[in-house]
């Protein structure tokens, strides 16, 4: 598995490069004015050099999080509880992050993210179980602030402070998404180098991330001005979101699909390490391969929905769910006790990540078109609750460290979950197949389809 993982990573990076090149040349550029504006380029650069260290710090923990808890000799059931606490924190933080960011200020929220994530990483140096749970809870809170705070600050400054055209926003976030893929791949390799090549142990990537967060905080304090969003009562936001869900069956189906799909992804995040680690798989390299597969999926989405191929986001969404179902079906066989096939499991995991790269932009496009902008925060809050509950219950109920086939049973249940998601997609498709609002124009792909 050692050499296989390295070859797979190189191949996936090459595939991503080819797909990204093809996607970039599949339609004419709509941002030539933005690229040629020196003030805009400088503003972008100032944002990126603050945002990217925070992204890198967030990614560095990914490859060795489960391994760290194993290194401290906790059982899989105990590790599952730590993860569930993180999911619970994400549920609560998801509900309050938007109003908190608006009231506290985006600049202060970015600083708060860095402080919370730093504290979370420092907690990982302790072997005390409740300290580790505290660290996971802090990590759950901080993850909800990452994208909402930084991107909300940039969007406000772009329009209000610098008065740049709104159509230039996708240029910034498209580039950020591409860089985010590269940063995630590099983070996996660096984490692998620290933990395995240098023999510093599974806690070392988290320690390495803290200086990056300090750098991000220093740049935010020195260079960014404060800005605030419109404040709405929490009850009103959630009430409006619930009414939108109940009055529009399409939104309810879309939320069900999101909860089913993403809860399976959360369980996959928990399971990939115990499946691959016993077979001498370099975890950082495997993580980088996952990120390369996801980035390739995002590039493939842009290519598939371009004017050259004319696929619609609904078709891509259906394809991504089919891919995950097939992957989970593979995993029920490749993880059978006494008959494990780690190479097949790795390929199945990579297919899941490729599907995620297709799923998220497709779901983002449909969400943007189906849910009114003023109600999106409230609706997304309601989406998050079943998502995290399904993931948490799946880990608590199904995973028994004393039962050899527990992992296989989890994949079987996840496959059934994806089958339910597929039925919801078919039901949604029958409702909206003639709805031109949910179709990309045949002349060119709209930027909103890849930015959500």
From Swiss-Prot:
Origin species: Xenopus tropicalis (Western clawed frog)
Q: Which PANTHER family match?
A: MOLYBDATE-ANION TRANSPORTER (PTHR23516:SF1), SAM (S-ADENOSYL METHIONINE) TRANSPORTER (PTHR23516)
Q: Which gene encodes it?
A: mfsd5
Main localisation: membrane
The highest taxon in the source lineage is Eukaryota
Topology term for the membrane: Multi-pass membrane protein
Q: Does the keyword Phosphoprotein apply?
A: no
Record GO terms (molecular function): molybdate ion transmembrane transporter activity
Give the subcellular location.
Cell membrane
User: GO annotations under biological process?
Assistant: monoatomic ion transport
Pfam families recorded: MFS_5
Q: Which family does it belong to?
A: Belongs to the major facilitator superfamily.
GO CC annotations, alphabetized: plasma membrane
Its biological purpose: Mediates high-affinity intracellular uptake of the rare oligo-element molybdenum.
Residues annotated as transmembrane? 1-21, 45-65, 79-99, 130-150, 180-200, 201-221, 251-271, 281-301, 316-336, 346-366, 377-397, 410-430
* Keywords (A to Z) from UniProt: Cell membrane, Ion transport, Membrane, Transmembrane, Transmembrane helix, Transport
Protein name, per record:
Molybdate-anion transporter
């Amino acid at each position: 598995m050692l050499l296989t993982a390295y070859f797979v990573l190189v191949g996936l990076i090459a595939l991503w490069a080819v797909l990204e090149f093809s996607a970039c040349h599949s339609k004419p550029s709509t941002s030539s004015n933005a690229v040629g504006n020196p003030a805009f380029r400088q503003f972008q650069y100032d944002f990126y050099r603050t945002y990217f260290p925070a992204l890198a710090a967030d990614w560095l923990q990914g490859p060795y999080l489960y391994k760290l808890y194993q290194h401290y000799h906790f059982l899989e059931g105990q590790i599952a509880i730590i993860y569930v606490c993180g999911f619970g924190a994400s549920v609560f933080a998801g509900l309050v992050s938007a109003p908190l960011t608006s009231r506290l200020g985006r600049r202060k929220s970015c600083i708060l993210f860095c402080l919370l994530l730093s504290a979370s990483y420092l907690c990982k140096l302790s072997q005390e179980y409740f300290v580790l749970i505290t660290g996971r809870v802090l990590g759950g809170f901080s993850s909800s602030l990452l994208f909402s705070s930084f991107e909300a600050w940039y969007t406000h400054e772009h329009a209000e402070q610098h008065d740049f055209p709104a159509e230039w926003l996708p240029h910034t976030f498209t580039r950020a998404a591409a860089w985010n893929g590269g940063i995630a791949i590099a983070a996996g390799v660096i984490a692998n180098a620290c933990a395995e090549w240098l023999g510093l142990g599974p806690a070392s990537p988290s320690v390495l991330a803290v200086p990056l967060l300090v750098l991000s905080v220093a740049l935010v304090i020195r260079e960014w001005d404060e800005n605030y969003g419109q404040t709405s009562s929490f009850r009103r936001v959630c009430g409006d979101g619930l009414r939108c869900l109940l009055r529009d069956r399409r939104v309810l189906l879309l939320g069900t699909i999101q909860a089913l799909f993403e809860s399976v992804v959360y369980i996959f995040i928990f399971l990939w390490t115990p499946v691959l680690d016993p077979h001498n798989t370099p975890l950082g390299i495997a993580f980088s391969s996952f990120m390369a597969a996801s980035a390739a999926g995002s590039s493939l989405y842009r290519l598939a929905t371009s004017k050259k191929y004319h696929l619609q986001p609904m078709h891509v969404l259906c394809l991504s769910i089919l891919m995950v179902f097939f992957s989970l079906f593979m995993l029920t066989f490749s993880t059978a006790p006494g008959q494990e096939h780690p190479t097949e499991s790795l390929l199945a995991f990579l297919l899941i990540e490729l599907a995620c790269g297709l799923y998220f932009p497709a779901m983002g496009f449909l969400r943007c078109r189906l849910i009114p902008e003023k109600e999106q925060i409230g609706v997304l809050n309601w989406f998050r609750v079943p998502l995290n509950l399904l993931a948490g219950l799946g880990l608590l109920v199904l995973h028994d460290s004393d039962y050899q086939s527990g992992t296989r049973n989890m994949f079987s249940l996840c496959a059934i979950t994806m089958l339910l998601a597929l039925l919801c997609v078919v039901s949604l498709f029958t409702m909206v197949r003639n709805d031109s609002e949910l179709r990309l124009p045949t002349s060119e792909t709209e930027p909103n389809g890849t930015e959500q």
